[in-house]
Amino acid sequence: MNQHITASQAIADPTHARPDASQDVVRLVDLKRRFGTTPAIDGISLTVRKGEILGIIGRSGAGKSTLIRCLNGLERPDSGEVFIEGREIGRLGERDLQPLRRRIGMIFQHFNLLSAKTVEDNVALPLKIEGRPKAERLARAAELLDLVGLSEKARAYPASLSGGQKQRVGIARALAARPALLLSDEATSALDPETTRSILALLKDINRQLGLTILLITHEMEVIRSIADRVAVIDAGRIVEQGPVWSVFADPQSDITKSLLGAIRPQLPAELAARLLPASGAETILRVDVAGDAASGPLLSDLATSVPGAFRLVHGGIDHIQQQPVGTLFLSIPGSDASHLAAVITFLKARQARVEVLGHVAHPV
């Protein structure tokens, strides 16, 4: 299956150029939406710049689905404004809203393909609804199926496809009308890990080749980590944290972000975590989160030469997110000398590390 996209395969409008990143495709201003007495969206303000991938993450019931319905005009907010390419959709009637919706493509968790239609007919469906000539529809479908690596499946029916292939058809269909914005609503949640990686790689390639703006809704931090440029964390209808992905991963501020990151951030080995005590013991265990220069420099060797006394690295490592080094180290500080422990923590914080005392162990690690 060909997943590589060459310049000759770029299927945007012939006049397409890499968009100006200073312009916003989406701008939300103090958006609010209630269902009864329950706020689904509670004052969200957000921008999505041209050509970027923004990930919106939160637990079930956080307001993600309501937000995406407000973006495509299927849900009217109680107050606030939704701008798509500079147009406030709340001021548009249904007739004016339809052409704007065609500027928005969408892919879904469960694909939403028409089982009685062939793959190429599913891809061409948005163009058929627009009344485009059959020859144009079929030519566009062929381009898109080549893009997503499914040219040989054009005459097949959805029932014969794997889950990953169905989602590729969904992506091709979402691109049929050359949208300015692609909304992805939990598009990989029903897929196995290997297929998820291939779909995310395809979306990233499409973003790079076409400059397509993507807003993806997910509850999986690994999805955000894989392809997003920025992330916004939603809880109870509010944005509790947002920023570049590497920055949020390196230094999460909110409890909900820390919880969502828990599954993919390095953790203290279970056998050592089980030995932690709140009271002083033979050794103190520190968690040290680093990013940027602190992660790429000789932090531990500098600590050894600058602060007299012993320490041990018991677990951890350095990774790269958005080409930025990000890591977590677990250090053991022997003894009960409070001044030595304070000196270690002071040194690490001076190097822009985030330090947390996890507890103590009664016997050496």
From Swiss-Prot:
Keywords: Amino-acid transport, ATP-binding, Cell inner membrane, Cell membrane, Membrane, Nucleotide-binding, Translocase, Transport. Residues 26-261 form the ABC transporter domain. GO terms for cellular component: plasma membrane. One of its GO terms (molecular function) is ATP hydrolysis activity. The keyword Cell inner membrane applies. ATP binds at residues 58-65. It holds the Pfam family NIL. It is a peripheral membrane protein. It catalyses: L-methionine(out) + ATP + H2O = L-methionine(in) + ADP + phosphate + H(+); D-methionine(out) + ATP + H2O = D-methionine(in) + ADP + phosphate + H(+). It is found in: Cell inner membrane. Its EC number is 7.4.2.11. Its main location: membrane. It comes from the Bacteria. Gene3D superfamilies: 3.30.70.260, P-loop containing nucleotide triphosphate hydrolases. The keyword Membrane applies. Part of the ABC transporter complex MetNIQ involved in methionine import. Responsible for energy coupling to the transport system. Belongs to the ABC transporter superfamily. Methionine importer (TC 3.A.1.24) family. The complex is composed of two ATP-binding proteins (MetN), two transmembrane proteins (MetI) and a solute-binding protein (MetQ). This is Methionine import ATP-binding protein MetN. The gene is metN.
